[in-house]
Regions:
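Sec-dependent signal peptide cleavage junction
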Residues: 22-41, 257-269
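C-terminal segment of classical bacterial N-terminal signal peptides
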Residues: 15-23
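Structural detector for internal amphipathic alpha-helices that build alpha-solenoid repeat scaffolds
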Residues: 26-29, 52-73, 94-113, 134-149, ...
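Charged/polar, low-hydrophobicity segments characteristic of intrinsically disordered regions
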Residues: 96-98, 205-214, 261-269
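Short coil turns that connect the paired helices of HEAT/ARM alpha-solenoid repeats
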Residues: 46-54, 84-99, 110, 125-135, ...
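Bacterial N-terminal signal peptides that target proteins for export
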Residues: 1-10, 16
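Terminal, low-structured helical/coil segments at or just beyond the last alpha-helical repeat
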Residues: 235-269
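Amphipathic alpha-helical scaffolding segments comprising HEAT/armadillo-like alpha-solenoid repeats
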Residues: 28-44, 69-91, 113-126, 149-162, ...
């Protein structure tokens, strides 16, 4: 009896020590050094023509390393500061000077739900509407998905279904693969819409065999652009290993009412 009590007390002490250690990792109050670094970042980023961007990137990298162990207020202020540099009118750059923006997008993606609002807002910002910013905007969508913030599932799905740019459609649909941990009903809704659009793109690219038909060519190019990322997203969300709109359509018709989180009878590939 005493040995059982002794083991229980030992376990309690160990667990208590673990909890105390975990709690100790979260600072009791905001760090003045973080505040100073954020002020420095703002100053560097606002220098005309991006003359101090390399120094600003160093500051961002230094802060990102500390993010997980920051006080919650510091984490929030950090994400906000990054977002303001990304979206702010005083930090305009030419596309060939985009490294600071790419660094920020990466950092915001790693900041989870604190970073997602700024990624979504920057994607819609007039600052990046010119076609030369397409690839950067695609990166915004990619890292918005990596935040795993469920508030932006609809945002990403809408871009995948409605955006007319092939790159952005592809990136938005591909970013949805990060939501494989969502409940089944959410994943099914995403898959239903993505599969339907995938099939539509495929069908429009095969209405005739005329290689000179510019409309058919446009749809074929679109299918080539979305195929890899959309297949990857559907595979993650369904836990299947199919490829191509025809196979996904058959899978959906056969299994839309089934529990995908349990082993399904394998579909023919």
């Amino acid at each position: 009896m005493m040995s059982h009590i002794a083991r229980f007390l030992t376990l309690a002490v160990l667990l208590g020590g673990f909890s105390a250690t975990a709690a100790a990792q979260v600072p009791a109050k905001p760090d003045p050094e973080v505040k100073a670094k954020l002020a420095e970042l703002k100053k560097l980023a606002n220098v005309r023509k991006g003359a101090k961007d390399s120094e600003a990137i160093t500051v961002i990298s230094d802060l990102e390393v500390k993010f997980e162990k920051m006080h919650p207020k510091d984490q929030k202020d950090y994400a906000k500061a990054l977002g303001l540099v990304l979206i702010g009118s005083r930090t305009k750059r030419k596309p060939e000077q985009s490294q600071i923006f790419r660094t920020i997008i990466l950092a915001l993606g790693r900041a989870g739900k604190l970073g997602s609002p700024y990624l979504a807002k920057s994607f819609d910002s007039k600052k990046f509407k010119d076609k030369d910013w397409i690839n950067l905007r695609g990166q915004m969508l990619d890292h918005l998905g990596r935040t795993k913030d469920s508030k932006y599932i609809k945002f990403l799905l809408d871009e995948a279904l409605k955006n007319i740019n092939d790159t952005l459609m592809a990136k938005a649909g591909g970013a949805l693969k990060n939501y494989d941990g969502e409940k089944l009903s959410v994943r099914k809704d995403v898959c239903k819409n993505l599969i339907k659009k995938f099939a539509q793109i495929h069908d429009n690219g095969n209405v005739n065999l005329d290689p000179g038909d510019s409309t058919v060519k446009m749809w074929k190019n679109k299918e080539r652009a979305v195929s890899e990322p959309w297949n990857a997203a559907l595979q993650k969300l369904t836990k299947q290993h199919l490829r191509g709109p025809d196979k996904w359509t058959r899978f959906w018709n056969k299994n839309k009412s089934k529990n995908w989180d349990k082993p399904l009878k394998k579909s023919r590939r």
